[in-house]
Design a protein with these regions (language model features):
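A ligand-binding cleft/hinge motif common to bilobed small-molecule-binding domains
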Residues: 1-3, 51-54, 75-108
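Acidic, polar ligand-binding/catalytic clefts
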Residues: 1-32, 98-107
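A bilobed periplasmic-binding-protein/Venus flytrap-type ligand-binding module shared by bacterial periplasmic
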Residues: 16-25, 110-130
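Beta->alpha turn/N-cap motifs
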Residues: 20, 45-46, 66-67, 83-90
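Short helix-initiation/N-cap motifs at beta->coil->alpha
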Residues: 25-28, 62-76, 108-110
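Short loop->beta-strand "edge-of-pocket" segments that line small-molecule binding or catalytic clefts
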Residues: 30-46
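Hydrophobic residues within well-ordered alpha-helices
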Residues: 33, 73-75, 114, 127
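Ligand-binding clefts/hinges and TM-proximal coupling segments of bilobed small-molecule sensing domains
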Residues: 37, 46-62, 101-102, 131-149
Length: 149
């Protein structure tokens, strides 16, 4: 059995916290979320469920069954906060003008890489070289800025 290969990493996905415009003044970082009376929402069975349980043991956690999602609970006013990746968060910020990012340092950086055939070292080397050149020229930084990452 062969395992997959990966390219060098080119950027990272991080976790951020979000709320609505009317509640943003209540939150100034991660610690302000981890309090009794704060309702956090997340989708049952996801990585975000585990992270929410670990990071916010003092908050009131609502687990939402898919296909519903934590952001929908917050937008509906039934919860105060949800967490998601910077990638999805950027999309939600542009889609819903009422959503606000809570000012807090991003958490849990996860490097992104391209899935590659492990046995094709020539191809892996080519892609790694391409990633290195693109990084040096600021390509991935420009993409991140363009898409609000």
């Amino acid at each position: 059995m062969k395992a997959a290969g990966y390219s060098d990493t080119y950027m990272s996905v991080v976790i951020k916290a979000f709320t609505t415009e009317d509640k943003i003044s209540r939150f100034d970082g991660w610690d302000s979320i981890n309090k009794a009376g704060v309702k956090t929402a997340t989708t049952l069975g996801t990585t975000f469920e585990t992270l929410s349980k670990n990071w916010f043991p003092n908050s009131d956690l609502t687990l939402i069954e898919a296909p519903a999602r934590g952001d929908q609970e917050v937008l509906a006013g039934r919860s105060d906060v949800f967490i998601t990746s910077n990638v999805e968060g950027s999309t939600l910020l542009s889609k819903y003008p009422n959503i606000r990012e809570i000012p807090a340092a991003p958490r849990n950086p996860t490097p992104l890489a391209m899935l590659m055939p492990q046995a094709d070292q020539v191809w892996i080397n080519f892609v790694d070289h391409w990633v290195k050149i693109k990084k040096a020229r600021g390509f991935f930084d420009e993409l991140a800025k363009k898409h609000g990452l």
